[in-house]
Amino acid sequence: MKNLENLYQEFKELRHFIHQNPELGFNELNTAKLVASKLKEFGYEVYEGIGKTGVVGVLKKGSSAKSIGLRADMDALSINECNNFSYASKNGCMHACGHDGHTAGLLMAAKYLANAEFNGTLNLFFQPAEECCDEELLSGAMRMIKDKALERFRVDYIYGIHNMPSSQMKGYENKKFFMKRGVMMAGVSAYRVDFIGLGGHASAPHLCKDPISVANNFVNALYTFKSLELKDSVLNVTGFLAGTTKAFNIIPNEATVMINVRGLSNDELSFIHKRINEIAKGIAAAFNVEVNVKRAENIKATINNDEAYDIAKNAAIKSFGENDCEFNHPHLMGSEDFSAFLDEVKGTYAFINNGDSANLHHPEYDFNDEVLLLASKYFSTLVLDYLKD
């Protein structure tokens, strides 16, 4: 793919521009305009405002009914960058997860494929807000799907990638490409549980309904539930908020417990959701207080489809060479909202080695520009193999 290599400098500079001008989830207005402008320049049909700030590019060639989708995320994180290079972030947030590179890499493939021969339809999904949810608790992928992106832009298969610092793939640092059959990444749910009691003076607890005591019982019950009823899932209490540090004689009205749950089975995540609600309501009833359980995040496990996996595996071996691919690495307990696409359409998710960079979400992280060529080559191979005559 010599012509692809000739595009490297152009998209390296584009990646640096996107990095320097990051935008948070559902606010990727300028990034989306840039993506749309580039796709139009390359000859794609362009559809904007899908999933609020998402963009879809469509390229049809030949007469085949076959179709394939590729996805990249566009949003940045609310982190102050600590790098001092010339293209460091300007906006008080930063691309600390490499979505600048994902976007530039898919655009690089888009330009290459615009001049390639294939038979079918290519749909490119540039997604907002992988890192956050909107007021309806919908992430960017979920919002695009709710906006009927997959109904309007039908695909037989959909594929996505993420860069991964080698330090986060211990034991596989020398590989370029990582993918596994079945469960790739965990699903995640987050909860805020508010116990509303009756505050008062610490000298008269009998006149109060102490929410701290109730919330403490709830936390203990959660960890008992965790040890007795869960198999592969991880449940952690990550916050306990109550009272004030400005006085010692006040029993507060409310106590809040924050919970993070990660699991490899969507069925078990649903079971955990049911049990958290049951336990919270049961303890609140036992101590005669009120309780509100709010789910703050709900991302399903990322599960690679077997059929799509076989297609992706062949493309990866062609792109990287079999010795540079790892197909048996352990699943990760991190989560990825690409799972929403995989819940609707056959597809796979994979990692590409970002080399010796700082870890994801670190203020000194930077996307490795060499991954632009690796990602665009993999994406292009997927398309040309599947949409061949």
Predicted features and spans:
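Metal-dependent amide/peptide-bond hydrolase catalytic core
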Residues: 212-389
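Non-cysteine beta-strand/loop elements that form the S-adenosyl-L-methionine
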Residues: 69-71, 191-193, 349-354
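Short, small-residue-enriched loops and turns at beta-alpha junctions
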Residues: 21-26, 77, 132, 244-248, ...
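Histidine/acidic-residue-rich, glycine-tolerant segments that coordinate divalent metal ions
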Residues: 84-94, 100-101, 116-236, 240, ...
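Acidic/His- and Gly-rich active-site-bordering loop/insert found
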Residues: 1-95, 100-120
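Divalent metal-coordination and catalytic microenvironments
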Residues: 18, 57, 70, 99, ...
